[in-house]
Amino acid sequence: MKGHIYKRGATYTYVVDLGKDPITNKRRQKSKGGFRTKKEAQAALAEILTEYHRGTYINESEITLKEFVKKWLELYSSTGKVKISTIRVRVHETNNILKYFKQVKLKDITGTMYQDFLLYLNTKFAENTLLGIHRTARMIFKKAVELKYIKSDPTQYSVIPKKQKTVAELESEEEIPKYFEKEELLEFLDTVKKLANPQYYTIFLTLAYTGMRIGELCALKWKDIDFKDKEIKIYKTYYNPTNNTIKYTLLPPKTRTAKRNVSIDDTLIKELKKHKTRQNKLKLTSWHDEDFVFTKIINYPGYPETPKQIELKMAQILKKSNIATLLTPHGLRHTHASLLAQAGVRLQEIMDRLGHQDDNITRNIYLHVTKDMKKEALQKFSKLMQNL
């Protein structure tokens, strides 16, 4: 760090070279004038240089929060460690931050201002949304401190406001998500077989027999299926926010536990082999051959089938069926969890199979199903004792 002094009219000014901006790579300088004597300017310059060499000097930038957020997003996106879908979430959350602070300078945002911001969010958004925005804000201000744009982090001592839950919200927490009973699942699959293209039968059978997410199913490739060892390797998910068939992306799973091997039975193996035979007969010279298991057939043949199309097809089939329970494809994941619980599989094993680290929905389904099983066991015991 270097500095010099020059005379400007009747007063003296010092200029300090602060090196290059870590984000823009441009040269940064700090100057201050109005000193009556050269000696006063030298003393002020010496104080700054001493702080700099001690590592305690920070030249707070005049940059606005909006300008810094733009730079932060560029840095955040360029690491190669963050998924596209996560970046989109961060962009959305920064928009909420900037709507509130508008053109405020980064250095002018205080802890009190940030706490007021959280109180404002608490009146507008659900708790999970508030927490997401807060996480993003903390990342932004932490990076600003790290890069010496500001001296302190205004989010550091903030307190997350809590809403008192309503009776309706407390009741909804206890609600069990919808799923098919065994008889309903069999009827649904039978209806699919009668009314839809054979590929859809294989799709819904795979979802119901593995509990995989619909994005995991759409990303599935034949190389992921080991027919010999009877298992499917799950390590990626389909991402297509624009729903443009040819502009899809395959992303790694969000969590470590989502990467897993799922055992499959002979029923599913037999159906997958039949599906592969049908697919091989359909392949044409225009086929987009990227080894996908479930693909478009007429338009864009070979491209992976989309979650939206599978959801639409399931809704159409349910309307034509006699099944009262209306589900989305994700409901087949809940169905799989409930059937495993009925079969006596332990909760942790179910969560491992579904790729969950911790999931209240799966736990609620498990407790609901096993509670009914315990009641049934007690009834059988009571009946036995009455017959003695």
Where are each of the predicted segments found?
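Short N-terminal "domain-start" leader segments
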Residues: 1-11
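N-terminal DNA-binding module of tyrosine recombinases/phage integrases
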Residues: 9-13, 18-112, 277-288
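N-terminal core-binding DNA-recognition domain of tyrosine site-specific recombinases/integrases
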Residues: 33, 37, 61, 73-149, ...
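Short alpha-helical segment immediately N-terminal to, or the first helix within
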Residues: 121, 179, 206-207, 339-340, ...
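Basic, Lys/Arg- and aromatic-enriched nucleic-acid-binding interface segment
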Residues: 127, 131, 146, 150-152, ...
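Short, basic (Lys/Arg/His-rich) helix/loop patches that form interaction surfaces
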Residues: 190-200, 210, 262, 278-289, ...
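Short, polar N-cap/turn motifs at the start of nucleic acid-interacting alpha helices
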Residues: 224-231, 324, 345-365, 375
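C-terminal secondary-structure termini that scaffold catalytic or DNA-interacting sites
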Residues: 229, 240-242, 247-259, 263-268, ...
